[in-house]
Amino acid sequence: MTWSADILTLYPEMFPGPLDKSLSGKALEKGIWNLNIFDLKDYGLGPHKSVDEKPSGGGPGMVLRADVLDSAINDCFKKDRPMIYFSPKGKPLDQEMIERFSVINGVSIICGHFEGIDQRIIDMHDIEEISVGDYILSGGEIATIVFLDSLVRLLPNVLGNGDSKKIESFTDGLLEYPQYTKPNEFKGLKIPDILLSGNHKAIKEWQENQSLSLTKLRRPDLITKKKDKI
């Protein structure tokens, strides 16, 4: 079965966007995955197709209405796949989570806006809240593109070299080692001699040491996380 993403958004024109380029675009063209876009405004109320209201209890901004979202979800989304909503309150997105979603038949995604969506919709439909980082975006579309770009490359027959995804950052819980290519010397900077030695055992050891050192320096939290899994 082809992996597919069903997306509910106020801005359907934002898709596929960059997802029709590079690896994800080629995979989309080949039918390795499908992208289905639904316009939330089609389910809006009244002559102005209203989809939001002021927050109950007061506060700034607007909240996407539960009745509008429920109608759209029931009409657009399949019952047999998980629903995702990107929110700063969600669980942090990581490689392990991406891999979990890549081995099922697809996901349904709600792109939020304004102050978010009515909590009752999250509770009623058992929606998984996910955060792409400790910062605020204008809407869920950009987060959705980040999520899908990362996921699609894990699908079968997307990457040309099957070993590529095995050695990337986060795949083994660490950051990837530095990469070099020709010319061997550039503006006085040389490729490390070990990488040109042909000694595969020594090269692998160098790569592992570099990976560990970089992770300790830039993402020590990953070291702790890796130890906790052992």
Predicted regions: what they are:
Residues 2-42:
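Glycine-rich, flexible N-terminal cofactor/catalytic loop recognition
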Residues 117, 121-170:
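Structured adenosyl-cofactor binding patch, chiefly the S-adenosyl-L-methionine
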Residues 41-46, 136-139:
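A short acidic, often aromatic-flanked loop/helix-cap motif at beta-alpha or helix-coil junctions
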Residues 170-226:
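Long, charged alpha-helical interface segments
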Residues 59, 112, 199:
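Conserved RecA-like P-loop NTPase ATPase core
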Residues 63-113, 118:
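S-adenosyl-L-methionine/SAH cofactor-binding core of RNA-modifying enzymes
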